[in-house]
Amino acid sequence: MAKSTVNKLSVSVRTNTGKGASRRARRDGKVPAVLYGHGEEPQHLELPAHAFSAVLRHVGTNAVLTLEVAGKEQLALTKAIDVHPIRHTIMHADLLVVRSGEKIVVEVPVEVEGDAGPDILVTQETTSIEIEAEALSIPEQLTMSIEGAEPGTQFTARQIPLPVGVTLVSDPEMLVVNVVNAPTDAQTKAKYAGEAHEAPEVGTAENKTAATESE
């Protein structure tokens, strides 16, 4: 993960809150946010939308930020973001106060790499796991290799290589990747033929009764 000093944002304190104030902030290119944690009073902030989005694109959703607030610096973890369903712009952010050297629990994506071989079907059952790591050493993602895996192989969370200082929080036996023989053409055709045979007739019993009575 990139160092927090790279993720430095100059932010302002929000004096007005509520939906109207949030809409105005977004029109001005700001993201309304709340900073909380460590027993401190929640602080309502406005983040520069373009710079904040750039950090999330390059570092990931577990980005640790260095916030410059009223002349002071504060480390914060991006805990949650609300994204507009159509425009895909960030509507709001929840930020968690963190301390240098502090260990925190976060969810990190898992990427599968490698080739299990021909005629093999690989299914990723879990796309992320929970880990504990120092706030400034959170990995952007974790990688699991399935190179040469044979049918019947199952990879669990405990088999994911973790960086030094990172510990697994998720269930070690949680299934991450399942490797099986790919179905043959004959099996696929038989499956679809069976599904077509089992498909119910169009129309409900009530409709058929009504049609019969109308005759």
Swiss-Prot record:
UniProt entry tagged with the keyword Calcium: no
Keyword Transmembrane helix: no
Xref: Pfam families: Ribosomal_L25p, Ribosomal_TL5_C
Domain of life: Bacteria
Bilayer-spanning residue ranges: none
Any one GO MF annotation of this record: 5S rRNA binding
GO CC, alphabetical: cytosolic large ribosomal subunit
Biased composition (Polar residues): 1-19, 206-215
CDD domains: Ribosomal_L25_TL5_CTC (cd00495)
BP GO terms, sorted: translation
Keywords, ordered alphabetically: Ribonucleoprotein, Ribosomal protein, RNA-binding, rRNA-binding
Region (Disordered): 1-29, 190-215
Family of this protein: Belongs to the bacterial ribosomal protein bL25 family. CTC subfamily.
Quaternary structure annotation from Swiss-Prot or TrEMBL: Part of the 50S ribosomal subunit; part of the 5S rRNA/L5/L18/L25 subcomplex. Contacts the 5S rRNA. Binds to the 5S rRNA independently of L5 and L18.
Stored PANTHER family: RIBOSOMAL PROTEIN L25/GLN-TRNA SYNTHETASE, ANTI-CODON-BINDING DOMAIN-CONTAINING PROTEIN (PTHR33284), RIBOSOMAL PROTEIN L25_GLN-TRNA SYNTHETASE, ANTI-CODON-BINDING DOMAIN-CONTAINING PROTEIN (PTHR33284:SF1)
Task performed by this protein: This is one of the proteins that binds to the 5S RNA in the ribosome where it forms part of the central protuberance.
Protein name, UniProt field: Large ribosomal subunit protein bL25
Organism: Mycobacterium leprae (strain TN)
Lineage: Bacteria, Bacillati, Actinomycetota, Actinomycetes, Mycobacteriales
Gene label: rplY
